[in-house]
Regions:
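Non-catalytic cap/lid and distal C-terminal segments of serine-dependent acyl enzymes
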Residues: 1-136
Length: 136
């Protein structure tokens, strides 16, 4: 749930963040079995989960100059649970720049994150440096 949390917190509290990235996030939980089950059980219904759905939140407006997502092509949850295509479509609709790197052969494991974490650290570092440069 780390990627999903990163996206939804950043999209809801965009003034507190300079950038956002995620590894294999659940992008549209109100439309997939994991999210439907969780929102019905914990919030009383799927509609209550829309404030916790990155795709629904992104449908409202462009927030960041870019969002970075890495996704493994061999992730067993890709087709039925993660829905990066829904997030990409929402981004397109509001003009939000989004990079979704489909990493060939990688699954949903720690090895996947370890292989690409440096890219995410560099991404955030560059965004923070650019932001600080506008303040100075």
């Amino acid at each position: 749930m780390g990627g999903h949390g990163a996206l939804t917190i950043a999209l809801r509290e965009q003034n507190d963040w300079v950038s956002v990235s995620a590894f294999a996030p659940v992008c549209n939980p109100t439309k997939v079995p994991w999210g439907e089950k969780a929102f019905k059980s914990y919030l009383g219904g799927v509609d209550s989960g829309k404030v916790h759905d990155a795709t629904c939140l992104l449908n409202q407006k462009t927030v960041f100059d870019e969002i970075l997502i890495d996704q493994g092509s061999a992730d067993e949850f890709l087709e039925n649970q993660l829905s990066p295509a829904a997030l990409a479509e929402a981004a397109k609709q509001v003009g939000q720049n989004i990079t979704i790197n489909m990493r060939e052969g990688f699954d949903h494991s720690y090895h996947f994150i370890a292989a690409f974490i440096e890219d995410h650290v560099s991404f955030h570092g560059a965004k923070l440096k650019a932001k600080l440069g506008t303040i100075a």
